From Swiss-Prot:
Function: Catalyzes the transfer of CDP-abequose on D-mannosyl-L-rhamnosyl-D-galactose-1-diphospholipid to yield D-abequosyl-D-mannosyl-rhamnosyl-D-galactose-1-diphospholipid.
Catalytic activity: CDP-alpha-D-abequose + alpha-D-Man-(1->4)-alpha-L-Rha-(1->3)-alpha-D-Gal-di-trans,octa-cis-undecaprenyl diphosphate = alpha-D-Abe-(1->3)-alpha-D-Man-(1->4)-alpha-L-Rha-(1->3)-alpha-D-Gal-di-trans,octa-cis-undecaprenyl diphosphate + CDP + H(+)
Pathway(s) this gene product operates in, as recorded in its UniProt entry: Bacterial outer membrane biogenesis; LPS O-antigen biosynthesis
Gene name of the record: rfbV
Domain of life: Bacteria
Similarity section: Belongs to the glycosyltransferase 2 family.
Name by which UniProt lists this protein: Abequosyltransferase RfbV
GO MF assignments: abequosyltransferase activity; glycosyltransferase activity
Keywords, in A-Z order: Glycosyltransferase, Lipopolysaccharide biosynthesis, Transferase
Enzyme class: transferase
Length: 333
């Protein structure tokens, strides 16, 4: 069986090399692997580094450098288009593979699931400081889910602890290539930062879809390096609302119960009080208004949200107080 590591990258030469090292250092597995890298016109010597790796290591590297920067969303998709494998393990170029992850994955592959979803370990930016040894996406142990009907999906959604359970985190996703290729992509998801989630949710909603949850941290997530924060902490919060409310409407507008179950996963990721306090600290007037509207769509009390937001100046003044700092740190990560 061939596993394709599908890695979108842009100017992350050093991090990418750490990822390749973590793959090369895997032991005790009996799988064929290939590395598929879509480089978004990097200028940091990534291409030269790849040439060195090709000469020094046994696994094949399929590398394509885009002539222009396509933007992150199109590059996510481009990395998968390079793959020849039975399964694609979609991987952020700043993350790393945990020890023995391929050997562990191999023990699950007999289920022939359409999707494998694994947990992650969270570290500092150096991949050394352990901040959370096991971040779980579901409140269950290992489980094989079969989605024959909407009740099956609703039960699954009720067990999600965050939007990681509905495919937000790239490096946790291992998907059958033929299932991915069968989806007719909706180009309106370009620019949402979550184009892959549209495809994964389309697979998830396919009758008979098999999802195998691996309650083990096979991935090391590099902290303090969220590319979604480039436009600020407040915008980072709104990205989740914009994409996941769109997903809720596009997939479940005709099933109120399932739509609510999906939206509740977003509320677990972005609990209203913590998130509103963070927005009060970091958001401008437009961003605060948008957050208030989003929570109203989720059934939250708009007056309560706006009351908390009005304390923005006070919240900003005391944001270094331990309690509030912990609140905002929980949301902005």
């Amino acid at each position: 069986m061939l596993i394709s590591f599908c890695i979108p990258t842009y100017n992350r030469k050093e991090y990418l090399e750490e990822l390749l090292n973590s793959i090369n250092n895997q032991e005790k597995f009996n799988l064929d692997i290939e590395i598929c890298i879509s480089d978004n016109a990097s200028t940091d010597g990534t291409e030269e580094m790849i040439d060195v790796w090709r000469n020094n290591y046994n696994f094949p590297i399929i590398y394509r450098r885009n002539s222009v920067n396509l933007g992150p969303d199109r590059n996510f998709l481009a990395s998968v288009s390079l793959a020849n494998g039975d399964y694609c393990w979609i991987f952020g170029s700043d993350d790393a593979l945990a020890k023995d992850s391929l050997a562990i994955l191999q023990t699950y592959l007999d289920s022939q699931a359409d999707i494998y979803l694994c947990d992650r370990k969270e570290t500092g930016c150096d991949l050394v400081e352990i901040r959370n040894p096991h971040r779980s996406w579901l409140r269950t142990d290992d489980e094989l889910y079969v989605f024959n009907n909407n009740l099956d999906r609703e039960i699954y959604l009720s067990r999600c602890l965050s939007i990681g359970g509905v495919f937000s985190y790239l490096s946790s996703l291992i998907v059958k290539k033929e299932r991915w290729d069968a989806i007719d992509f909706d180009a309106s998801y370009i620019g949402t930062s979550y184009p892959h989630v549209f495809i994964m949710m389309s697979v998830f909603n396919t009758p008979g879809c098999l999802l195998h949850y691996i309650s083990k941290p096979l991935v090391i997530c590099r902290g303090d390096n969220d590319s979604f924060e480039k436009k600020g902490k407040a915008r980072r919060i709104l990205i989740d609302f914009i994409a996941y409310l769109k997903l809720a409407n596009d997939f479940y507008s005709k099933n109120i119960s399932l739509k609510r179950a999906f939206e509740n996963v977003l509320l677990k990721e972005r609990p209203w009080l913590y998130t509103t306090l963070a927005m009060a600290c970091y958001g401008n007037s437009d961003e605060k208004r948008d957050l208030s509207e989003f929570y109203a769509k989720l059934g939250c009390n708009k007056n309560m949200i706006n009351t908390v937001l009005r304390f923005g100046k006070l919240a900003y003044a005391v944001k270094n107080i331990t309690v509030l700092k912990n609140f905002t740190k929980r949301i902005i990560k």
